[in-house]
Amino acid sequence: SARIVYLLGKQRKLGYHDNPPVAAVVNGELKSLQTEIPENAVIDLVYLNSKEGRTAYRKTLCFLLSYASTVVYPDRTLLVGHSLGDGYYFSYKNKEKPDIDKLKKVMEKAIEDDLIVDIETLSASQALTYVEKMKLKDTEKLLKTRNDGAYTFNRIGSALSVSYEPLLPSLKLLEVWDIMEYGGGILL
């Protein structure tokens, strides 16, 4: 099998305004560009300006904030609140006040460094160990009810998140965003 990302070659040089491919439908199923595919698969590229592409963009931004939060506040638990227009509201579990400047600097540096969003498969025990260590109680409950032998996670640096939908293959595409304090939490 081959990785879709290798088929695209120069894709990482494209920017936000180039409407690059950001995911693919492989044999009828939406997949990340890092997904390994069978040799004879039917592939339809998904572009950034499509509905699915915009969803991947927003989900990648959310994961980037989660990554920045683990760098700035390794002992805090970031909670995803609700959507607010085109943005998302986040807060910390114990209502700690965020330092928006520190979070934004980490996010900007990750984009500047073009960190890769990797896909990683963890055994059930590895996944449970990670979510327990990070005090992700809801994710822990979910993994225990699914009872799978392995789970797919997205990774940026040391930050992991269960993979539900494709994310952008590269943070360099995150050109249009902002973060601000709102209601004691964070608006992304």
Positions of PLM-derived features:
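Ubiquitin-like/PB1-type beta-grasp interaction modules and other compact soluble beta-rich domains
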Residues: 1-62, 66-67, 71-84, 95, ...
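Auxiliary tRNA-acceptor-end handling modules of aminoacyl-tRNA synthetases
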Residues: 35-54, 77-188
